[in-house]
């Protein structure tokens, strides 16, 4: 299995208590090599203000969000391994984990898995796409040793 090259950038006011780089690497490696040989992904961990600004600029949503995915579009005729960027908001991930009663580490893992699938072209706009994407997320999360992230919705 090929390994994903990770460029981890921490842009939070306080970076203490964040997952280790090795954890981010493990989570990426559980997803991307199944679909693509050589890949490079940037993960940028930000605070609420940056997430809010990016979400408003790129999605027209006036609030912070847990994860944004920015796939890299390779120009025709060029071969590059850059898959794209994930921007994850620390405070939103922490708040969601608490509200949903999920272990924080598991929710971080889920955000990386979810965002990575977006980089690979998966989406959840249509119901059938959402079902396919959620099934993949669940399969990957279980393989990583975490619970089904959608278990509460299925009960």
From Swiss-Prot:
Tagged with keyword Nuclease: yes
Cellular compartments annotated: Cytoplasm
GO cellular component terms, semicolon-separated: cytoplasm
Alphabetized UniProt keyword annotations: Cytoplasm, Endonuclease, Hydrolase, Metal-binding, Nuclease, Ribosome biogenesis, rRNA processing, Zinc
One of the GO BP terms on file: rRNA processing
EC number of this enzyme: 3.1.-.-
Top-tier EC class: hydrolase
The keyword Cell membrane is annotated on this UniProt entry: no
Residues engaged in binding Zn(2+): 114, 118, 124
Primary location: cytoplasm
InterPro entries xref list: MetalPrtase_cat_dom_sf_prd, YbeY, YbeY_CS
Cofactor(s) the protein requires to work: Zn(2+)
GO MF annotations, alphabetized: metalloendopeptidase activity; RNA endonuclease activity; zinc ion binding
Textual note on the cofactor: Binds 1 zinc ion.
Function: Single strand-specific metallo-endoribonuclease involved in late-stage 70S ribosome quality control and in maturation of the 3' terminus of the 16S rRNA.
Family: Belongs to the endoribonuclease YbeY family.
NCBIfam families: rRNA maturation RNase YbeY (TIGR00043)
Protein name according to UniProt: Endoribonuclease YbeY
Taxon lineage: Bacteria, Pseudomonadati, Pseudomonadota, Gammaproteobacteria, Enterobacterales
């Amino acid at each position: 299995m090929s390994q994903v090259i990770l460029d981890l950038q921490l842009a939070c006011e306080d970076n203490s208590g964040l997952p280790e780089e090795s954890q981010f690497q493990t989570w990426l490696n559980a997803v991307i090599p199944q679909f693509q040989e050589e890949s490079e992904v940037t993960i940028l961990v930000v605070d609420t203000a940056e997430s809010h600004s990016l979400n408003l600029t790129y999605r027209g949503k006036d609030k912070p969000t847990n994860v944004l995915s920015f796939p890299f579009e390779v120009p025709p005729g060029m071969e590059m391994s850059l898959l794209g960027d994930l921007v994850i908001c620390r405070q939103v991930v922490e708040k969601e984990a608490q509200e949903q009663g999920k272990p924080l580490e598991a929710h971080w893992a889920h955000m990386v898995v979810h965002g990575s699938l977006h980089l690979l072209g998966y989406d959840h706009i249509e119901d059938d796409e959402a079902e396919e994407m959620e099934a993949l997320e669940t399969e990957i999360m279980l393989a990583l040793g975490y619970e089904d992230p959608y278990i509460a919705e299925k009960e």
